Swiss-Prot record:
Organism annotation: Mus musculus
Name this protein carries in UniProt: Homeobox protein Mohawk
Residue runs in coiled coils: none
Subcellular location(s) per record: Nucleus
Superkingdom of the organism of origin: Eukaryota
Keywords, comma-separated and alphabetical: Developmental protein, DNA-binding, Homeobox, Nucleus
GO terms of molecular function: DNA-binding transcription activator activity, RNA polymerase II-specific; DNA-binding transcription factor activity, RNA polymerase II-specific; DNA-binding transcription repressor activity, RNA polymerase II-specific; RNA polymerase II cis-regulatory region sequence-specific DNA binding; RNA polymerase II-specific DNA-binding transcription factor binding
GO cellular component, one term: nucleus
Record Pfam families: Homeobox_KN
Biased composition regions of type Basic and acidic residues, renumbered to the chain: 18-27
Family (UniProt): Belongs to the TALE/IRO homeobox family.
Gene that encodes it: Mkx
Protein purpose: May act as a morphogenetic regulator of cell adhesion. Participates in the early events that lead to differentiation.
DNA-binding region extent: 71-132
Length: 353
């Protein structure tokens, strides 16, 4: 009699009926195999605990991957938060001690608390001192030399962003400072000299454009020269007009009192134009010594011309005097091209016979 046994995989296994002894022997063998506890591992049937260990290892590996991603994300977030602090530290590398107001602004910009900002700067200064172990160095030199002295996986003070990029190893200067100094307009020649010396020292070609600008002193001097030239033309024109009026009056023979007063009051005889008219009174003139002394007061262009005019005026006044014993006359003395002197003198007149 045949017996059909269905295994777990759904396949049919056919056993032949060999008799009772064979059946008992087969049943013993099968039962012995099931009853023996040491036969399990040899066949390769896994027990419960090894399966749990494998599952735990798998979960542990996936968890490690997830945790690694979280750590990297957290590190990147911390670097992004610390970037404004690094930028401030590099810009103020001569004195890396922010004030309370600056700490508050940095805390708002970096999404940190005020305590975190203070701790970050304290740790940064401590790292600079411990890494660059030279006692007589300034903070700026420590910051520039930090990346050369740092070892291992320690954080470096490199600042990079979209707005400005600068490395604090001392080799490349910050680009924003170079642009600010290179395109600044100089105000004086000293600024231009300072920029040229900076070009020789730092090799910045952008600041050469600063020499093309015109300094304010030159501009002011040009305006002043233009103003002085206009004023000089005006004075020369006024002086020429005054000389023409004086010559016409000299040819007429004498000044009237009204004309002389108008000459004194007129604005054309101002100090700026250099025209002076004044009057002197002398009680007596008995000889030509007074005239000669008055003529020697200032240099004249044509002394002979004016002497002849004075002599003609004296003869005219003498000829007109009939009953008078004493009279007055006017004498014009030309001091220079733009200075005239009017002198009124008393002369004894000779009676006619």
């Amino acid at each position: 009699m045949n017996t059909i046994v269905f295994n777990k995989l759904g396949g049919a296994v056919l056993f032949e009926d060999r008799g009772t002894p064979d059946r008992e022997r087969g049943s013993r063998t099968f039962s012995g195999f099931l009853d023996n506890p040491h036969t399990g591992p040899e066949v390769g049937i896994p027990d419960g605990p090894p399966l749990k260990d494998n599952l735990s290892l798998r979960h542990r590996r996936t968890g490690a991957r997830q945790n690694g991603g979280k750590v990297r994300h957290k590190r990147q977030a911390l670097q992004d938060m610390a970037r404004p602090l690094k930028q401030w530290l590099y810009k103020h590398r001569d004195n890396p001690y922010p004030t309370k107001t600056e700490k508050i602004l940095l805390a708002l910009g970096s999404q940190m608390t005020l305590v975190q900002v203070s701790n970050w700067f304290a740790n940064a200064r401590r790292r600079l001192k411990n890494t660059v172990r030279q006692p007589d160095l300034s903070w700026a030199l420590r910051i520039k030399l930090y990346n050369k002295y740092v070892q291992g996986n320690a954080e470096r003070l490199s600042v990079s962003s979209d707005g400005d990029s600068c490395s604090e190893d001392g080799e490349n200067p910050p680009r924003n400072h170079m642009n600010e100094e290179g395109y600044s307009t100089p105000a004086h020649h000293t600024v231009i000299k300072g920029e040229s010396s900076a070009i020789k020292a730092g090799g910045r070609p952008e600041s050469r454009a600063a020499e093309d600008y015109v300094s304010p002193p030159k501009y002011k001097s040009s305006l002043l020269n233009r103003y002085l030239n206009d004023s000089l033309r005006h004075v020369m024109a006024t002086s020429t007009a005054m000389m023409g009026k004086t010559r016409r009056r000299n040819h007429s023979g004498s000044f009237s009192s009204n004309e002389f007063e108008e000459e004194l009051v007129s604005p054309s005889s101002s100090e700026t134009e250099g025209t002076f008219v004044y009057r002197t009174d002398t009680p007596d003139i008995g000889s030509t010594k007074g005239d000669s002394a008055a003529n020697r007061r200032g240099p004249s262009k044509d002394d002979t011309y004016w002497k002849e005019i004075n002599a003609a005026m004296a003869l005219t006044n003498l000829a007109q005097g009939k009953d008078e014993v004493q009279g007055t006359t006017s004498c014009i003395i030309q001091k220079s091209s733009h200075i005239a002197e009017v002198k009124t003198v008393k002369l004894p007149l000779v009676q006619r016979f």
